[in-house]
Regions:
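Short loop/turn segments that flank or connect secondary-structure elements
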Residues: 1-100, 104-235
Length: 235
């Protein structure tokens, strides 16, 4: 996928310049703190992964979807959803038993763009439980010229990643008349089970009906944009 190549080249150049200032990025192999976050992606990225799933990956994915559907019965707002996802739903279903990404070559733009300027422990901290002094110490340690404040993740790579995501969604909108983004694992599962990308869909309602049939037409999970005017659709 060309957008992935563009981001990888951009990130490589950015890292070279950043490390030349003797500053560190703490991401490394078998570090998977960020894999507990709800990963946002575009549907074309999910399609690319769904096409090559192994039996083990499919099983882990289905287990995750079942846990997620149960959790959604208790959630109504984005903040609660993101917190529950991070703390209770378990890591990304594509994380293998050794703590490595099993879809690394085709991982989405949002994963590629996430670079940590602080040690891994900060990627899993529940900031709502930190006292005032710990929060203050954390914030004072951040380089505001580099990070997406108030997080410790690099802003430049995330900004470029979002630009590339928008390009993918615009291309999908032009080709199909609708576009879909949101929870990456949910979209991979949806494509694996419904082959939505291969449907000949004549109306926006058909897309919404398919999401509803799979119990996934939820604004916390997916963002469906329909029609030439870019109308948003979600329950």
């Amino acid at each position: 996928m060309n957008q992935h190549d563009h981001l990888d080249k951009f990130t490589s150049a950015w890292l070279t310049n950043y490390r030349a200032t003797e500053k560190a990025i703490y991401c490394c192999e078998h570090c998977f703190g960020c894999c507990h976050l709800a990963v946002h992606a575009t549907y074309p990225e999910a399609v690319a992964v769904a096409e090559g799933l192994t039996g083990t990956q499919s099983k882990r994915l289905t287990d995750y979807i079942e846990r997620l559907k149960v959790a959604l019965t208790e959630l109504t707002d984005l903040k609660s959803y993101l917190k529950k996802h991070r703390q209770e739903l378990g890591p990304c279903p594509f994380l293998d038993g050794q703590g490595s990404c099993s879809i690394y070559p085709t991982r989405p733009l949002s994963c590629r763009a996430l670079l940590s300027t602080r040690p891994a422990v900060w990627c899993t901290v529940d900031f709502s439980k930190l006292d005032h002094w710990d929060k203050q110490a954390y914030e004072s340690s951040l380089d505001r010229q580099v990070v997406a404040w108030p997080t410790h993740f690099v802003a430049a790579t995330q900004d470029f990643g979002r630009e590339l995501e928008n390009t993918l969604l615009e291309l999908m909108q032009k080709e199909k008349g609708w576009s879909l983004s949101g929870n990456f694992a949910v979209m991979v599962w949806l494509e694996k089970n419904s082959q939505l990308s291969k449907h000949h869909i004549a109306t926006n309602q058909q897309v919404s009906d398919i999401l509803t049939a799979y119990e996934l037409n939820n604004h916390l999970l997916l963002d469906l944009t329909c029609g030439s005017q870019g109308t948003k659709s979600a329950e």
